[in-house]
Amino acid sequence: VIEQWRKALVLAPHTDDGEFGCGGTMTRLVDAGCDVRYVAFSIATRSLPPGFPPDTLAREVEEATAELGIPAESLTVHDLDVRTFPQRRQDILELLVALWEEWAPDVVFQPSLHDVHQDHRTVAEEGLRAFKRTTILGYEIPWNNFDFAYQWYVALEEHHIERKIAALERYASQQHRRYANAEYVRNLARTHGVNVNREYAEVFQVYRVVA
C-alpha cells in the first residue's frame, strides 16, 4: 500500500522526533521512489547540553535525514522556541496550510494526539486541521504516549532499521538520553514486527485514510 504514495510529509516538532517515530518507514518510502519531505519546527537550542553550539541540532538533522536518503532540499528546519508551541499555534497552522496548498502530500506522518509533550500535541492538533483532506498517521514516541492504540503497521527489514539507527546516531548532542539507544530502537521495532509475523515494524495511529 505505502508504495503507492508519491509524496510523504513528516512533521517533527523537534529535530529527531521524525526519526524516532518513523525513521524506518521513511527509508522504505525513499527506496520505493517516494518524495519524502521532512519539516522540523524547533532546534531546541535551550535544551542542548552544555558545550554544544546553538546550531547543533540544525546540523545534526541534516546529517540524520541524509542517512535516510532525504536530500537537503527536502528538509525544512524552523527555529521556534521549545515548549512554546501552544502560544504559537496560529503560526504553526499557517505554516502547515501553506505546505498543503503548495505540495498536497499523499500522506502526513505526525505525532500522536495522545502525546503529552505540549509541542508535540500542538503540531498533531494543527496537522489534523491543515491536512484534513489527505491521509494522516500518528507516529509512536513511547516515552511520551500514555495512550497509544495503534492500527497501522509498516513492515520493515534489517536494512531499514540499520539506517534508522544510523540516522539517530548522528545526533551526538542527544546520545545521553536513555531512549537514544540502538538496542532499544531495534527491540521496539522487533516487538512490533513479531505481532504481525514480520522481522520489524513501526506502528501508527490512523486519523484519516484517503484512498
Regions found by a protein language model. Name each.
Residues V1-T135, Y184, L188-E199:
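Active-site beta-strand->loop->alpha-helix modules in alpha/beta enzyme cores, enriched
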Residues A40-S42, D79-D81, E140-P142, E157, ...:
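Residues at the C-termini of beta-strands that transition into short coil/loop
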Residues A72, Q175-H176:
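Surface-exposed helix-capping loop/turn segments at secondary-structure junctions
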Residues V82-P86, N144-F146, H160-I161:
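A short acidic, often aromatic-flanked loop/helix-cap motif at beta-alpha or helix-coil junctions
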Residues F85, V154, F204:
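Short clusters of hydrophobic/aromatic residues that line enzyme substrate/ligand-binding pockets
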Residues T134-A155:
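Short, flexible loop segments at boundaries between secondary-structure elements
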Residues V154-Q174, A180-R190:
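A conserved mid-domain beta-alpha-beta active-site/ligand-binding segment of alpha/beta enzyme cores
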Residues N197-A211:
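Short, basic/aromatic-enriched C-terminal tail that caps enzymatic domains
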